[in-house]
Structures are given as C-alpha cells and as structure tokens.
Amino acid sequence: MKISILLPYKENFSSKYAGAVSLFVKDTTIYSRYKNSIKIFGHTTYKSKFLSNYINLDIKKSILQSNSKIYVDKFLEYEKYLPSDLIEIHNRPNYIKHLTKKNNAKLILYFHNDPLTMNGSKSLNERNELLNKTHKLVFNSKWSRSRFLQGFSKFEIEKDKLIVIYQSSKKVKINFNKKKKNYF
C-alpha cells in the first residue's frame, strides 16, 4: 500500500521552525507500521528535513495564480506516475475538491484546527461535500469534531466516518497516588 501525506503549503517539515502539523506527521510516521510505504510531500526552503521519506515540492511562485493550487498541481504530477492508494491531507480542506478531480486514491482529511474557520469547510454545504469526497475525517479533539458537525442532524453522518486522534503519540502514565513530600 502506497501512502502519501500532503502537508499544508507553508508547513516546514524541518527541525527548524517546525509547526504542529509537521511534528504530528513526523511522530506518527515513525511509529506507523506502514512507515516504509509512506512518502511525505511539502514545500520548505530549509535543508534539514525530519525524515528521509520527505519529498520537497519546488514550485515557482505566481502573482497570477494561487500558490496553493500550484502546490497541489505539483503533487498531482507525482501522483500521475506513482499513484497512491491513500492520501492524507492535513489542515487544508480546500485541497480536497482539486484532488478529487484528478485522483482516485482514498482521501483522509485531518483537522488540526477549527473547521469552521478554514477555507473549504466553513459552510454546511462545503462540509457535506467533504463527507462525500473523503474516506475518513480525522480531528485532533472532540471539540473540533463537534464544530465540524454544527448544522448536521445526528442521523446524516456515518459514525465511523469521523474519528478523533489526539495530538500526542506517546501515552504518559502519571501516578496520582504518589504523595508529595512536605519540605517545610
């Protein structure tokens, strides 16, 4: 199974100035059973990349066309020659419409922020379209999932279509029974 992860256009997948999405993708990729089948696509000018399976999409910026559209088109050029079975899109619901026109892979969209503030998921119609065009929608909290669901009746959506994956890939156990020592 070939898996491609498409980062947001301005996300740095580098140890310098990495954003929350890059850190999440790096951590989950390292622990994934599919890590050898994953390619991560992004656009950064920094040389030190987190992982060797990162592919930098060099694009020429344009004042006449959306740089995000140019970025997605560049990704689709790779997909033409080495098609993915599954594509993860992080935090860019507006990429979905463009990807579904030219691709047959299963799409999974991750929401790391409030869906109602993002281009491509602000309106109920846009969110309904995302439900129809994606295989899964993943949220980083129950709150962001509930924001996405605003305006839908609970019977309109398949329950297994929406999942919550918290941003921590390591579970830390805290012993609350351990008593603090009083030093005073």
Please provide the spans of the model-predicted regions.
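A short, active-site helix/loop in glycosyltransferases that binds the activated sugar's phosphate group
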Residues: 134-161, 169-171
